[in-house]
Regions:
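Short, solvent-exposed secondary-structure boundary/capping segments
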Residues: 30-38
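Short beta-strand-centered aromatic/proline hotspots
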Residues: 17-29
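Short intrinsically disordered terminal tails
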Residues: 1-3, 127-133
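Intrinsically disordered, low-complexity, charged/polar segments
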Residues: 39-105, 110
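Amphipathic alpha-helical interface segments
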Residues: 10-15, 25, 60-61
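Short coil-to-beta transition motif at edge beta-strands of beta-rich domains
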Residues: 1-19
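Short, solvent-exposed coil/turn segments at beta-strand boundaries
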Residues: 1-3, 26-31
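Extended alpha-helical coiled-coil "stalk/arm" regions
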Residues: 101-126
Length: 133
């Protein structure tokens, strides 16, 4: 890939054993492609976090065992790609908090509050995303 193809690539938030990877690729017929995968972060395999390859107008960022969330989308608007990026950053935190709650940790009320706040923020982002349609 040359510099014109790769617009951005970000590995975000290693909260405990979770990681989110977001990136956008520029193609001649589609300005932005946004791909996200959230998965358990396998420390023993950290040197090969993901593989990428172009498939027509799509980006395949590989597959992992038991992904928590796996979704792909594409847009010609950078603002929309950024909204999706923000949404999935929040979803990874939500999954992390939900995991802690299911483990019945002592600070369960704190994490339930955090989950509630994230749900509201995600709903706001979804409304912005829907306004593009």
């Amino acid at each position: 890939m040359n510099n014109n193809d790769l617009l951005y690539e970000v590995a975000l938030g290693k909260d405990s054993e979770l990681i989110i990877i977001t990136y956008a690729i520029k193609y001649s017929n589609c300005d932005f492609i946004h791909a996200v995968q959230v998965k358990p972060f396998i420390r023993s395999n950290y040197t090969k976090i993901f593989e990428s390859k172009k498939l027509n107008n799509f980006v395949d960022i590989g597959y992992y065992d038991n992904p928590i969330i796996k979704t792909y989308g594409f847009t010609k608007k950078k603002e929309l790609a950024e909204l999706y990026k923000e949404k999935y950053e929040k979803l990874i935190k939500f999954a992390y908090y939900d995991n802690l709650i299911s483990d019945k940790i002592e600070t369960i009320d704190y994490y339930k509050t955090k989950e509630f706040e994230l749900k509201k923020e995600i709903a706001t982002i979804n409304a912005k995303i829907n306004s593009f349609n």
